[in-house]
């Protein structure tokens, strides 16, 4: 490698002997010189990069002669000079030694971190970025991802065109092969010369010196790590140009007629290569070498678009399947909610039924007894619920011995009584032509044989209980003839009651009461008899009674005694 001179101000270079070399010749002492170049201004040189760039040169060169007559302003850089790039990963900082950065680089110890030489993978792990799958994206050079700089050709593995493991997996394989390498001192085309200021003075170069065993490097905020190798136009020209020898070689093969055979052989080799990749995938996990082969073939023949189309189709299928899965999952969740609701409903129903069964059932109150309508001329009398009341005798009424008849005026009347044995008469509301009545007839045990007592039935209403002092009041209590319940018989007696309407010319009403002696009674004079009578009247008489409030007078009651 040709030597190149780097001009620095006098006195800025300090040579420090390393430990362990005290017994050797001072002229052969190795030192480490760190050159910290300031950012290169854009547009000063035609060959300058688009962005500001800086080169950090860590050199361990041998100074053969240090004499007083040698100008210290010029320092020879030989093959021992090493190029280093300041890199970062998260908050961690380190130096990438380019001459040790060989393909594939991931497990190669080429990073100096905390005075230790480690691999880029280990450096990413120590920086806490091990979750990132691509170590080239985790490591940054001047704030730019290392992968981006390698894809653009700004930096590449050391002697990548000679030493390649086919596992570098570069996305721009051909471009990297033909692109220029990192700047190496001694190569005139790749070394960035020290820029000068506008007034012609040399830009100051800060030089710091450290021993190889000392820890850490002093970082200057003015450092940048963007190192450009060539312009974009130069890269395109180099990638598109084909040498004359290559063209003549393939033309000669075609001229001699071997092109078909060569193409067939190339095709067979490629098929065997791809077939081997498929077979290895069946028997073993995917290897890095297989990935390198596929990547090189795809990039060489321009098949990356085909690979991308396959990936897009699979992505669409996966998205469609995911949508179907989400829809099915939502439907299952909905069915589960419905089943939960259905399982809860029987529980609620059973609980409700149980509560209803355990609830005390309240007996509905019996309906109130409807009030009976009566003529306005009558008076309402409330019977005593405790005991049967005794009523005053209504005159004129006569109770005669057997065979003698007596008469009652203004039937029905409220009460008939004589002495201590009252006679009670009750009425029912007007109904059809055929009336049925029932009551209990009893006779109080007394010394008088003429005493008759009529007690009211439970289904009858008492019309009047007015106490009568003379017979003149009877005419004022005349009421409409209603269905009459008239009972006046003792057990063992025969009574005949004839009711005659004196004012009616069409007919008369006859009420017959037949005796029904109680077969179980020991004393026929002290037992009650339940009688049923039917009152039959002529149609015309009953019709007249319903249409008008007609009065019946002069009813004769005949009591026959056996």
UniProtKB/Swiss-Prot annotation:
Residue span of region Disordered: 360-384
Binding of DNA, residues: 129, 133, 136, 147
Domain of life: Eukaryota
List of residues that carry N-acetylalanine: 2
GO molecular function: DNA-binding transcription activator activity, RNA polymerase II-specific; DNA-binding transcription factor activity; Hsp27 protein binding; identical protein binding; metal ion binding; RNA polymerase II cis-regulatory region sequence-specific DNA binding; sequence-specific double-stranded DNA binding
Keywords, ordered alphabetically: Acetylation, Coiled coil, Cytoplasm, DNA-binding, Metal-binding, Nucleus, Transcription, Transcription regulation, Zinc
Residue ranges constituting the SAND domain according to the UniProt record: 72-156
Coiled-coil annotated spans: 311-357
Cross-referenced SUPFAM superfamilies: SAND domain-like
Biased composition (Polar residues): 375-384
Places the protein is found: Nucleus; Cytoplasm
Keyword rRNA-binding: no
GO cellular component: cytoplasm; nucleoplasm; nucleus
Main subcellular localisation: nucleus
A GO biological-process term: positive regulation of transcription by RNA polymerase II
A Pfam family per the record: SAND
SMART domains: SAND (SM00258)
Binding site for Zn(2+): 103, 160, 164, 168
Function: Trans-acting factor that binds to glucocorticoid modulatory elements (GME) present in the TAT (tyrosine aminotransferase) promoter and increases sensitivity to low concentrations of glucocorticoids. Also binds to the transferrin receptor promoter.
Subunit architecture: Homodimer, and heterodimer of GMEB1 and GMEB2. Interacts with the glucocorticoid receptor (NR3C1) and NCOA2/TIF2. May interact with HSP27 and CREB-binding protein (CBP). Interacts with TRIM63.
Protein name: Glucocorticoid modulatory element-binding protein 1
